[in-house]
């Protein structure tokens, strides 16, 4: 089901965490790893005549630095893949980062991204601009890795009955089987009747697994907060959830619960579509 994993790296420490996670996941799933590093146009071509009569600086040295950084990032990723005995291919590109990742992701089954980018320390937001753009635009499942995340422990499946959550359940079954980890199913149970129906549905989707399946419900608090809290409590290695809730409005933005979980979780989050 997951034969090719795509990961993008900018060489930063947050990206290095995602590199390790992607290489380890590819090894355990026996998947190929495709690495890309992108020299962004806004950096390589960001200085131009702005009408003030001030000539822009020479870009040759900056372009050479950015290209060298991109090549070194891919070399580091390749070394990690080889250490895990993973088949690895790489590509260095120049352009608009999120658009190029989305384009290359069409040939992959899963995209793995660092949550924070190279400039994380200079901003107040909690998701890097490139990762945010990819999550908004891609039609592929995306795994967002925060700093400190480890590929160990059970899976937490947040299930709300949406199409994305059903896809997430299928991915969770695949991952749990291949990783040999249990699944904890979280359902927001403020509406008891709906909660019962959702647990019944997810039991049918999960089927008869060779790993334990446990159920968690919550009647209090915001679902995104309870999902993260539950994942912490069970020491989950990954949270799996749909990109959109049942009240989906637009194709362009991921749902509010998924967005909040991605922003705040200390655990990797797989967003399914």
Where are the model-predicted features located?
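A short acidic, glycine-rich active-site loop
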Residues: 55-71
